[in-house]
Amino acid sequence: MRDIMVPMSFDKLINQCLTEYRTKKSLFDVKAIVTADTEKNMEFCGRGLESPLGVAAGPHTQLAQNIVACYAGGARFIELKTVQVMYGEELGIQKPCIRANDEGYNVEWSSELHALEAMNEYIRAWFATKIVAKEFGLGNPDAFQFNMSVGYNLEGIKTPAVDSFLNGLNDASTTKVFQECKQYLLDNLHLFENVDADFINSIPAHVCNTITLSLIHI
């Protein structure tokens, strides 16, 4: 396992999802894919939610492909990896920074990506998860939720980098990555069987409307 997390380009992300599911019926090696029961929808914080089950923030919710894998495994409430003003080698601590007595997917610092990189990655994941939900009939594309997570002190949260991250996920419509992802999908409609231009244009720019504050970090 490599010790540096490298985001996947959006076109590669989408093509990997389409090719793998159509040939193997899996998504990023998740074979036991969960299809939601559409009769058991609920509402949380003003948005639809097919299941209250999901994943907490961690290295498994930092890269877009891992977020898609979480959704494929049944997660419908996804707490995105915590963002802070310091990241990577700037933290000055060894990896991994969390004890794993048995085994775990944890080879990262408490923040591997810069706030802007994290925002871009989560927006790519937002589009990709919407697409796999619709294209493969895994559930209602409007019934899963992303939850922002920031820390670890007020001074860091108020910095321009983290503030821009918060604003970008609250309304991504003017971000470059949102526009690029949307345009890529519109330009490649031939790749899809169940996704059309109307669906792509309906994908909301308000990625997150809830937030988790991470205030304790040991």
Question: What do the PLM-derived regions correspond to, one by one?
Answer:
Residues I216-I218:
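Conserved small/polar residues in nucleotide/adenosyl-binding loops
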Residues N201-L213:
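Surface-exposed cleft-lining segments at the edges of enzyme active sites
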Residues M1-D37, Y71-R76, L80-I200, P204:
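Conserved, well-structured core domains of diverse proteins
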Residues F44-C45:
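N-terminal alpha-helical transmembrane segments of multi-pass membrane transport
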